[in-house]
Regions:
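N-terminal leader/linker segments that initiate helical-solenoid repeat arrays
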Residues: 1-77, 85, 93
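Conserved structural position within tetratricopeptide repeats
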Residues: 63-67, 97-100, 130-134, 168, ...
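Helix-start (N-cap) detector for alpha-helical repeat units in TPR-like alpha-solenoids
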Residues: 72-73, 106-107, 140-141, 174, ...
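Canonical tetratricopeptide repeat
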Residues: 77, 111, 145, 192, ...
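Position-specific recognition of the canonical hydrophobic site in helix A of tetratricopeptide repeat
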Residues: 83, 110-113, 117, 151, ...
Length: 272
């Protein structure tokens, strides 16, 4: 059953909620959040004076880096200046250097991947995401970023294979606490896989994936909510309604308002 545009919108919001709830980071890409923060500070339309000031700052940092190429304070300063200028192409070089100097700080490599994706260097973005996942396989933001990159290029099979391989890797490493892959949040990755199937309107696979996720953690409200959303999309409102209520009862307080909004939307859909 094909949902209306507004219906699809709240379903998508619900899927985003259930996928990223309980995680410690925003779902917004790191680069986007930085740029939006700067724009909200009045930097979206730079005056000539501000442009000149930033250009002078950039030159100063570059002069320091000519003498001290590994000076991280100068690299961070140059990166921040380039971002304030909105010049992502020029931000790549200091980002690459910072990522190289700080291999354990995943934010630099993640920001590099997102910047390359923004400037349509998709091969470079893919390489950066893969490099990050090789050293930090538990980084769900990187996994989601690479998955979305594949999906945006209509590389659906690669996206699904990537997520499935991550689940397999996590399951194999579960008994080895020294393996970084043992830190992968398997339920969240399963929810990501289910979301891909949902967006492809492959509802049987989505439901099966959410069932597996629920079996992994019977106390997690997210697979229950996801199942309800899929059933709602199929027009199975009577089956969906008790699952929405169950998800609401299991969810932490911080997420109940959003779930209640989904339930109200579901009830409106039933009356129509």
């Amino acid at each position: 059953m094909k949902a209306s545009l507004s219906n699809r919108r709240w379903l998508s919001i619900g899927l985003i909620l259930m996928l990223f709830a309980l995680l410690s980071f925003s779902i917004m890409p790191l680069l986007t959040s930085i740029l939006q923060s700067q724009h909200s500070s009045g930097q979206s339309h730079l005056s000539a004076v501000k442009q000149e000031e930033l250009a002078s700052q950039a030159l100063g940092y570059q002069m320091v880096l000519e003498r001290e190429p590994d000076n991280q304070a100068a690299l961070r300063g140059l990166l921040d200046t380039r971002l304030q200028q909105g010049d992502l192409k020029q931000a790549i070089e200091p980002l690459e250097k910072l990522a190289q100097l700080n291999p354990q700080q995943s934010d630099y490599l993640l920001l590099l991947a997102e910047a390359k994706q923004q400037i349509e260097d998709y091969a470079g973005a893919t390489a950066s995401y893969r490099s990050l996942l090789a050293s930090h396989p538990q980084n769900l933001r990187a996994l989601t970023g690479l998955t979305n990159l594949f999906l945006s290029q209509n590389r659906h099979n690669e996206a699904i294979s990537l997520v499935k391989d991550t689940i397999d890797r996590a399951l194999k490493a579960a008994a080895d606490p020294n393996n970084p892959a043992s830190l992968i949040d398997i339920v969240s990755v399963q929810l990501l896989l289910g979301k891909i199937y949902f967006e492809q309107q492959n509802y049987p696979e989505a439901l099966n994936t959410y069932k597996q996720a629920q079996q992994m953690d019977v106390n997690d409200f997210r697979p229950i909510l996801a199942t309800a959303i899929v059933l709602k999309e199929q027009g199975k409102n009577q089956e969906a309604q008790p699952l929405f209520q169950e998800a609401l009862s299991r969810a932490p307080f911080a997420y109940r308002e959003e779930i209640q909004s989904l339930i109200r939307s579901q009830e409106i859909g039933v009356r129509r």
